[in-house]
Amino acid sequence: FLIGMTQGLICLITRKC
């Protein structure tokens, strides 16, 4: 839930998935 959203945001911001 929250962890998934946070990881998604970091992925979008840093472009590092």
From Swiss-Prot:
Q: Which GO terms describe its cellular component?
A: extracellular region
Is the Disulfide bond keyword given for this protein?
Answer: yes
Give me any GO biological process, just one. Answer: defense response to bacterium
Which key words are in the record? Amphibian defense peptide, Antibiotic, Antimicrobial, Disulfide bond, Secreted
In which domain of life is the source organism classified? Eukaryota
Coiled coil, from the record:
none
Which tissues is it found in, per the record?
Expressed by the skin glands.
Record-stated family: Belongs to the frog skin active peptide (FSAP) family. Brevinin subfamily.
Q: What does this protein do?
A: Antimicrobial peptide.
Name of the protein in question:
Brevinin-1DYe
